Amino acid sequence: MLEINDFNAIRISLASPEDIRSWSHGEVTKPETINYRTLKPERDGLFCERIFGPTKDWECFCGKYKRVRYKGVVCDKCGVEVTRSKVRRERMGHINLASPVSHIWFVKGTPSRLGLLLDISPRNLERVLYFASYIIVEVKEDMLQVAREMIQEEYAARRQKIQKQAEEKRIELSTQLTQDLGGMETAQRSTQRQIEEEYRRLRDEIASEAEQLRERLEELSGTLADEDILFRGVTVVEEGEPINENTLDQLDELVEQELEVLEERRRRDLADAELLTDAERERKAYEATQEQERLQERLQRELDHLMREEKEKLEQLDTLKVGRIITETEYRQLRDIAPGVFRADMGAGAVRELIEKTVNLDKLAEELQAEIQSSQGQRRKKATKRLRVVEAFRKSGNRPEWMILTVLPVIPPDLRPMVQLDGGRFATSDLNDLYRRVINRNNRLKRLIELNAPEIIVRNEKRMLQEAVDALIDNGRRGRAVSGKGKHRLKSLSDMLKGKQGRFRQNLLGKRVDYSGRSVIVVGPNLQLHQCGLPKKMALELFKPFVMRRLVERGVAHNIKNAKRAVERVRPEVWDALEEVIKDYLVLLNRAPSLHRLSIQAFEAKLIEGSAIQLHPLVCAAFNADFDGDQMAVHVPLSRKAQEEARTRMLSKYNLLSPAHGEPIITPSQDIVLGCYYLTMVRDGAKGSGKRFSSIDEAMLAYEKHLLDIQAPIWIRMTGTLSGKSDRPVRELPLAADGTPRMLIETTIGRILLNNELQPPLRFRNRLIDKKGLKEIIADCYQYYTNLRNLSEDQLNEVRASHGNKHVQELARIYGSEMTAQQADRIKALGFRYATLGGMTIGIEDIEVPAKKYDIVREAEQLVADVEKQFRRGLITEEERYQEVVRIWQEATKQTIQAVKENLNPFGPVAMMSTSGARGNINQISQMAGMRGLMSDPTGRIIELPIKANFREGLSVLDYFVSTHGVRKGLADTALRTADAGYLTRRLVDVAQDVIITIEDCGTEEGLWLHGADDDELMEKLQVRMLGRILAAPIYHKETGELIADRNTEIDEELATAILASGQESVFVRSPLSCQAEHGLCRLCYGRNLATGKLVEIGEAVGIIAAQSIGEPGTQLTLRTFHTGGVASADDITQGLPRVQEIFEARVPKGKALLAEIDGVVQIVRDEEGVRTIRIVSTDVYTDEYPLGRGFSPTINHESEVYEGQVIAEGPGGAQIVTRLTGKAFIQGDRIIVSQEDHQERELVVPHNARIRVENGERVMAGQQLTDGSANPQELLELQGREAVQRYLVNEAQKVYRSQGVNINDKHIEVIVRQMLRRVRIEDPGDTGLLPGELIDSAEFRRLNNDIVSQGGDPATAATMLLGITKASLNTDSFLAAASFQETTRVLTDAAIQGKVDYLRGLKENVVIGKLIPAGTGIEKRIERPHEDLIGEMARMLEESQQAEEAPAETRRATPLPTPNGNKAPESDNDALLRARLEELLSGDGDNDQSDAEEEDNDLPAF
């Protein structure tokens, strides 16, 4: 039978309309929710019982069927199935949409998946979906051709008509001109006639006048004229002159002249008339020509216009392609041009139709592949993006048209509840409002379509439906968010998943749990390390069901109901039952914030009075708890397995070492330290000083008789040896009779008392014990008792009896933990006792102000006055003055601290507290007794006005005001830092949550070099760094060459000492950075588990441990640098938390250092403006030599330039020598030497405030730092490769933590850095089927390449990518983990399109779906073993068992193999089983054609 919850992968994909309908139990057609009078769900509404199931268990809507006996009956009256009401949490409905709508995730995401698939820009796609533009969905090709021909015919006819009209007009113009010219001829002749007649009349007039005058003159001839006689105004005879023959001649002359003038005028008039006629004729002819030309132009214009119009229309027809987007105007035009040729539409329906008709994924993939191969730059980038989407659809089996919804699922009503409030009003989930909007608009649209409403109204309603569905899926993604009453934004389905309040983070990754409580904590000084005090009232509530059961079992109550009553009334028997119950249970205590795994530990509960939880003082450090009002939560692990896990793994006494650095975390502190310090102090001159005793017992007797002071130095003879150095004299004595060493030592009673409390192997410690000393005792104790060599068989059997038959290493760990816990408890009791008896307390008298202080202050004031004087005189700048003043006061503060130190009474309580490490440090004492010194202002700049007073003297108002600045900044910084550190931890956990120890050995030959030369004041010593690592190569003695240790040996304390003693200064070790495990890490690359001091176990969640170890001390790091004012030098730009974030996010650092891009020689150049440039010049010279054989002669001259492939010498028979280089040729005797210089230059401009690290002429390597600051890790990766950047990131992170005194093992940082470098970017896909630019896991990449190479194909090439932790988290293989981290909608969109499968390998994804995490005890089921590994291992085991049988009886050791049912089989059966299984596996070799599906189901038992 298949277990429904037992699956090992989960897949997400797009839902088809058929899927949505198959999930549904009915269609929701009404927007109603519940009836306001009956308060029952409306039929066919959003809460309909017929669709979603009954609201009451086993009862139908109308009440016809009630009770469980009708289970499964569907009521014939109301249609409701009689079943449990909880089906309303799982039954879905659906809405049939009247018009398809797009799913906003696939439209508005970046990049728009729908847009990429259709090759439409997101803006255009949006215009189509929201009814602003049309998209062509169909073009009828045959009709298109007909339309083209019709247009061509129409325009041909129009051209013909225009040409015909133009011809007619031309003929008309020509005729008109001929007529006009003829008329002009006639008019000209008529004018000539008129002129002739006129002149004839004038001639006649002159002749007639002349005749009359002649007659008169003839009459008067011979007489004198009595007046002037005139002819036409000209005097012929003046008055008094005689009239004679001459007078007549004169008259004739005048007549002749007159006639000549007249004739001249006649000729002129005739000529003028002719000229006028000619001009008119020419004008007419010209006008006619112009008109003809105009006509011709107009004709041409009209023809051109027609041609253009025709061309445009034909072009528009040509652009009628399916998928083209057109505006409303263009649509109308095209519809007029080519009616019936095409169909265009708007909205999601059009897009869906387009996808169904045009998208052929296989063909599209081929086209895009070809384009990627042939194109460059932006086009290639776009094609790759498109291909990624196309391939996702192809491989996943999703259909692209499913991105457009035709059916909308309605989620179960109990997931969008509606509840009645006190006042009778209802509170409802926002989803109901959003669904109502969809249903209302959908119903309205259906009605409009039925009524055949105008297109514009239907279109508007479709757009509104699209917007309603958008708001339901992801409100606010497009346009204004839909808001409900009170203007609050309605929470859509996407909002239900996103963010801290979303489904993933609020309900799946963290839940509120039952059987828990919380209370204030108080100290429990009398508890043992594995105990806590639980208030009785609280315990009774937590264990109520168990107590009730126990009461029934004991017969105190007859049934559960009575038992419950007894518990509620708190009868005396209840406490006895509670005592019994609580014996078997451990409880978990948790203090928020849970920054690391030690924030939750298991304890045995001791019932106490009162209401506060009592906590053991030594576990406070792990919880980071104090007793100033802290609260803690209690949880009860319920199941047997949970209890067992709590007991074996979480009990506080088994969590003594910090997983971050492997040192004890239960170190005594405060009072305990003070008590032990007081106890081990030596006070010369105290009562009984210098006395001698023959034994410890004798000395103790003297002390008890009050003859000795507890701190008096006394001499004692004792047997045994000293543990560590002694701070008092020691004299060795002759050995005792049994050979034990003896000595005479100076010590004190206090030290004897302390040593009496130590385990025997840890004695005798004859020195002042401070906090560090106590830490050493705990560490030594754990180390001694967990080392198998120090344990006897009896001790191991003792553990076996109580903890079962476990592995000896595990038994040693348990024994060591228990012994250390006992030791810690004894020290605790001793410390508390003597802190009390010592009576050390601080009074105001203990704080003495040193007399020197006032001199120091006066001196400093004088120096400051001198500096001010120099500044006023202009000898120094304002900045220099400030720096000098700050320096003077810092020096004065330093001197004051020294003075306070010297002035302290070493036996005074203040000094004891400080020097023992119990509380406080010299700086704080100095603020009380010396001077407070300089303060920082809110920006972090130091205020140059110091506080010269101390708290003993009291601060003035100004002092107090100045000090508030720094204090306030400190508080604000702490608050900010906490949030930042929390977020950093979250990102680290996310990036490393799937790093689990999955296999024994990945078999890699790679590793990490640890160099002793790297030891500096910040880095740990080599001895510490190599502890717990596994050797990656054999290590030999430097001088003798003998093998010290082989590969894959764990370096423990002894081996580390031996390696250093052999003179080796560097060690090649395995590291998580180089682990080749396909999933998680292997045991050997990780090495020692720091929390146990033993090799890490399979199933350990080392990724999370690493993240917690780095994140937990994050709050201790400073937030920003305190600048000492002025320009910060580049090396102090970022420190503390921001620097850690910078490192793990792989950002370009602030104050970035310049790196050398090539190997070469440095030249530092400064231009006129003072800008510095570093030039790196690299000159490589290559030479090639060509010997000249017999008969060969050069064809070039000495020192001539030659190029590659040039003939440089010829020999007999046309033989030639050709050069392989381009450069200069030198002829030297019988050979030619060609020399080529490869010259490279790089110039880098140095920022004005950067300090240059290199000298002029210095040789540098690529990737070397040229200026101060932090290197950009991306550049480092490019220039020096993966190993350099790994080393850099680990060292940089360590520098930040170590500078703050935080100790973290390198291993943890390496785990994170490995995750940052896990991806590679494909450059050339080869035959792998990957896409260029795709990010892929490096293990997956190696596997694909190996498969391809084994099949004879071309492998892919790729570049290592360095991703920041946020990006790396989002790029994880698990979509559940990525979606629950950040950018939920984007992750789910991508995953759905790709049909991603989550194999549930990490922790988060298993927590999300509610399965046990594949770590710790949850991994046994999960260990994946490849087929070949299994066969190999079985073969090896078979061989071993055979060897064992052949071996002599005394050397034979039984190593029975667990059979599948967990029992141990007898040896012979075991062999038979192995052999049979092995043969079965090997026989399957020849017949290896099982389908993949069969192979997956054929799970092998995990042997």
From Swiss-Prot:
Q: Which InterPro entries match?
A: DNA-dir_RpoC_beta_prime (IPR045867), DNA-dir_RpoC_beta_prime_bact (IPR012754), RNA_pol_asu (IPR000722), RNA_pol_N (IPR006592), RNA_pol_Rpb1_1 (IPR007080), RNA_pol_Rpb1_3 (IPR007066), RNA_pol_Rpb1_3_sf (IPR042102), RNA_pol_Rpb1_4 (IPR007083)
Q: Which domain of life is it from?
A: Bacteria
Q: GO terms for molecular function, please?
A: DNA binding; DNA-directed RNA polymerase activity; magnesium ion binding; zinc ion binding
Region of interest (Disordered), residue spans: 1439-1503
Q: Catalysed reaction(s)?
A: RNA(n) + a ribonucleoside 5'-triphosphate = RNA(n+1) + diphosphate
The entry marks the following residues as binding Mg(2+), namely: 626, 628, 630
Name of the featured protein: DNA-directed RNA polymerase subunit beta'
Q: Tell me the organism.
A: Chloroflexus aurantiacus (strain ATCC 29366 / DSM 635 / J-10-fl)
